[in-house]
Amino acid sequence: MLSVILKESVRNLGKAGMVLKVKPGYARYLLTQKKAVRATKENLKSLEEQYLFIEKENLEKLEAAKVLKASLEDEFLIITRQAADDGKLFGSVTPKCISKLLSDKGYNIHYRNIFFYSVIKYIGEYVVNLELHPDLVLPITLYVVKNDLGAMQAQKLHAEKKRKIEEGKVEKGSCTEGESLELGSVDNDINSGNVDSNESEKQDSVSE
C-alpha cells in the first residue's frame, strides 16, 4: 500500500486534503491523473500550505469541468454489439468502451470516471454517467445497437426525443434504465435490427 495526499475529492475514496493508503496500481492512477501527491515527509509537513493550493486548483478544475459539460450536453453515444434474437448481448459494454467512444469524439475522459447504475446486458437505450469533477456528474444517452441500420434508427430516435424536449413534451434524461426495449415499436426495431458500475468496472479491473 502507498500513502498519498488527495489533491481533489475522489468518488468512493475521500475528500481533497485527506491522507490515504491505496494499492500501488490505484496510486499510480491518482498520481498520473494529478489527483494526488505522494505522502512524503515534506508533503505531509506542508499539508496546510498544500491544502490552500489544493482548494485553488480544485476550483479551477471545477470551472474547466463546467466548460466541458457545456460541450457534452448535446452529445449521445452509439455502440454496436452482437446480440441474440432476444436482444441479449454476446459481449459486454464497459466504462473502457465508453471512454474509447468519447475519445473518438475528441473527449479525454478516463474510464474510472465513467459509471452505470445498471449492467448493460441488452440492446437498447441507457444512461451513462460521466464524472467530469467530483462535484459535477453529467448523464448522457447511450444506444446499444446490433448493426448500422440500428444505429441509423437510434439517431432518428434521439433527434425525435431532442425535439420533444425542446417543445417541453418530455423531460431531459427521462430514459428509464433497463426498460428501453419496452418503449414501443421503435426500440423493438432497434432490438431486432429490422429498422433503424458495478459489474462492468470489475471486468475492466480484471483486464488491466
UniProtKB/Swiss-Prot annotation:
GO BP: translation
GO CC annotation, single: ribonucleoprotein complex
Domain of life: Bacteria
Keyword flag Transcription regulation: no
Residue stretches of biased makeup (Basic and acidic residues): 199-208
Keyword Transport among UniProt keywords: no
Protein's job: Binds to the 23S rRNA.
Protein's UniProt name: Large ribosomal subunit protein bL9
Gene: rplI
